[in-house]
A protein has these predicted regions:
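Tryptophan-paired
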Residues: 1-26, 106-197, 229-236
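A short, Gly/Thr-enriched small/hydrophobic beta-strand-prone motif that recurs across taxa
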Residues: 89-101
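Sterically constrained small-residue positions within well-ordered secondary structures
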Residues: 78, 89, 103, 160-162
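Low-complexity, Pro/Ser/Thr- and charge-rich linker/hinge segments at domain boundaries
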Residues: 41-47, 190-211
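Short, low-hydrophobicity acidic/polar segments
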Residues: 1-92
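Hydrophobic, glycine-enriched assembly/anchoring segments
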Residues: 199-236
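Residues at beta-strand starts and edge strands
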Residues: 6-8, 83, 92-94, 108, ...
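Intrinsic-disorder/low-complexity, polar/charged segments enriched in Ser/Thr/Lys/Arg/Asp/Glu/Gln
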Residues: 84, 95-97, 153-154
């Protein structure tokens, strides 16, 4: 029950039902936690935190707008002022697609690795609230693939990564008993890439493509889209 004398603002969080069981506090198979960086919890410090920083669920959120009939009251209201609430969820996470083609047959596998990952995002707008700590500051393995028809294609959800902590990616190439690490090199692009480090904003999809022959030279930024329609082609 809501107090009639109090004023409310309603935040709605969207996620895959199998990723979190709200009724049981998350459940044994939950993929993320809901918490806050301070006490009491407020909209400014409420966060969503993947259990595994390299396995990011798809998050959405929005503020509800209160209505009295067809009249918009707004996002802040008293219960007596409204008779229903509506809102449009917006994706909080970012996406990365990295494709490498023309991979020689002697390559057994390729592993995508990242450093300086964001570990918790603000529930209201996707702002980064926590990062890898000093004791956990190393690189993180995102995925490993064996080439198929000379190609690998990595598709990853990531928490939004601000310019101040933009992320460097690596590819570990394994062949026989040897593994070599290559930095994913990209041309500088304002607001997206600087010094090979990539910036991700909420609902932002970055696509990187390149031939194996250029793995030590540099790849191409083939896609850089901040989508308002919440539809990402190729990233499921």
């Amino acid at each position: 029950n809501l107090s009639a004398a109090s004023t409310y603002q309603l935040l709605v969080i969207g996620y895959n039902r199998s990723d979190y069981d709200f009724a049981s506090g998350g459940g044994a198979t939950k993929r993320f936690n809901i918490g806050s960086t301070g006490n009491p919890a407020t909209l400014a410090n409420l966060y969503l935190q993947p259990v595994n920083p390299t396995v990011v669920p798809e998050f959405f959120s929005c503020f509800g707008n209160g209505y009295q009939g067809t009249t918009l009251v707004g996002p802040v209201f008293k219960p007596s002022q409204i008779n229903y609430v509506t809102g449009t969820l917006k994706r909080l996470v970012s996406g990365l697609t990295l494709e490498v083609t023309n991979i020689p047959a002697y390559v057994n596998s390729m592993t995508l690795i990242a450093e300086q990952l964001v570990t918790a995002t603000r529930a209201t707008d996707g702002t980064a609230l926590a990062w890898q700590t000093v004791g956990d500051s190393g690189t993180k393995t995102l995925a490993t693939q064996a080439p198929v028809s000379g190609k690998v294609s990595f598709n990853q959800f990531l928490l939004a990564i601000p310019d101040s902590r933009k992320t460097l990616f690596y590819l570990d190439v394994s062949y026989g008993i040897f593994t070599e690490r290559y930095t994913v090199k990209l041309p500088d692009t304002p607001g997206v890439v600087s010094g090979n480090r990539i910036i991700f904003t909420p609902n932002h999809w970055v696509k990187v493509t390149g031939s194996y022959a250029n793995i030590n030279i540099g790849f191409t930024l083939a896609g850089n889209i901040n989508l308002d329609d919440n539809a990402w082609d190729g990233l499921q």
